[in-house]
Amino acid sequence: MCEGPSRISGPIPPDPTLCPDNYRRPTSAQGRLEGNALKLDLLTSDRALDTTAPRGPCIGPGAGEILERGQRGVGDVLLQLEGISLGPGASLKRKDPKDHEKENLRRIREIQKRFREQERSREQGQPRPLKALWRSPKYDKVESRVKAQLQEPGPASGTESAHFLRAHSRCGPGLPPPHVSSPQPTPPGPEAKEPGLGVDFIRHNARAAKRAPRRHSCSLQVLAQVLEQQRQAQEHYNATQKGHVPHYLLERRDLWRREAEARKQSQPDPAMPPGHTRMPENQRLETLTKLLQSQSQLLRELVLLPAGADSLRAQSHRAELDRKLVQVEEAIKIFSRPKVFVKMDD
């Protein structure tokens, strides 16, 4: 449904066939846009068409570009991002982003390689200094023996005989080797050989071994001494330790016994009445001893009373002694028990 002329302004004109009465097209545009076959009579009459000869369309210099934009659309032109086109046409070639990190690493490696090559060429051109070996400071004042030997003057002539260490010298069990006649060296001649090449050392050592004194091995004596020491140690063990309880075990047994007694005494007696406490054993025995002494003293006084005294004073004294004896006997019976309970004071 059309509500008047279109208000869209752009390179793409609206369709004039929707509302032909609202559009005024020039004659040149009618044949190009609407077409001659439609033969729409917008604002011209048949007489003007008949009398006026048709003219060709007026095409400006930018008409081709406008037509191309109308066919392709303006969105393709507006959304061009760095040569990337959204239209059907051929797009420009996209450039790959440059990796600056790899480029920097490559340049650093090139610089390091060039620096190493310069160092190598510099080292090859200069002599290397020798590294001094470590030497203890206590040998600073000690002269080198090799240096002293090198500084000594050599022999005047090369005809002097050199002194060599023989095979049979400074060897053996520590005893001086027997003097055995050795072959005399022949005077040097024109065909003289080096010293020591004409001596049969194997035969010489065999003769020296036969003539050397034999020494008995001391292994049997050492074995006898070890066996004697073991026998004495076994006898001492049998006499002092075998069959006897060690001293530390005896002490441990006494300690356990004392701990058991203390634990037994500290436990409350089930036969003890409430409000009482058990009298210590030493106090009980001390009290019992005093009661026995009092009993013997009362019996002695009772025996010493006169038998024929019938006075009131004698009778009262006898009755008093009897009453005390009864009390002492009752107390002796009480304190003779293994456990005596005493009432605690409030």
Curated annotation (Swiss-Prot):
Residues of the region (Disordered) are: 1-35, 114-137, 167-197, 260-280
Q: Which Pfam families match?
A: Enkurin
Q: Which domain of life is it from?
A: Eukaryota
The record lists the organism as Homo sapiens
Residues in the signal sequence = none
Which residue ranges are recorded for the region named Required for binding to microtubules? 91-171
Pro residues bias: where?
174-190
List the subcellular locations. Answer: Cytoplasm, Cytoskeleton, Microtubule organizing center, Centrosome; Cytoplasm, Cytoskeleton, Microtubule organizing center, Centrosome, Centriole; Cytoplasm, Cytoskeleton, Cilium basal body; Cell projection, Cilium
Q: Which GO terms describe its cellular component?
A: 9+0 non-motile cilium; centriole; centrosome; ciliary basal body; ciliary base; cilium; cytoplasmic microtubule; microtubule cytoskeleton
PTM sites of type Phosphoserine: 91, 136
Q: Answer whether the UniProt record assigns the keyword DNA repair to this protein.
A: no
Q: Which gene encodes it?
A: ENKD1
- GO MF term set: alpha-tubulin binding; microtubule binding
Q: What is this protein called?
A: Enkurin domain-containing protein 1
Biological process terms from the Gene Ontology for this record are: establishment of mitotic spindle orientation; motile cilium assembly; non-motile cilium assembly
Q: Where is the Enkurin domain?
A: 251-343
